[in-house]
């Protein structure tokens, strides 16, 4: 009996987590975790601020969402009118942390990461691109740094195959994943 191909959704997001090993061993359990089931759907989580021995945060939010791009074709899958891997999918994950402090020397007002994955056609790799990611209000020992993320690089090289080729060919922009200035 031949198994029917099916699309498996995967999307996970974590807010704040850590395992500090020195000078003391401290595990910070994941705060605000979202994980999609293999059927897709929506997972959201929020965490109100907490203070741990070495770090603290004011709030954390995560979201993982995955679905077929065409609702009618998704219904057709349930009636076995089409194969589940014949309908394009989009998976989006977001993690947003506000008011993050490490010891008393590093402070970040906003850390936001968003990734969007679009399923590839049969035999093609999935495209994964950043969208709306940011690091804002970063201060280290009182010195403010402005961080500019190199999203353009990851949008251009949005599959593992493209990224491997860029890294192997020594793309100059690959070495600059982010820039900071004070």
Language model feature labels by segment:
Residues 1-182:
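Extended, solvent-exposed, non-transmembrane regions
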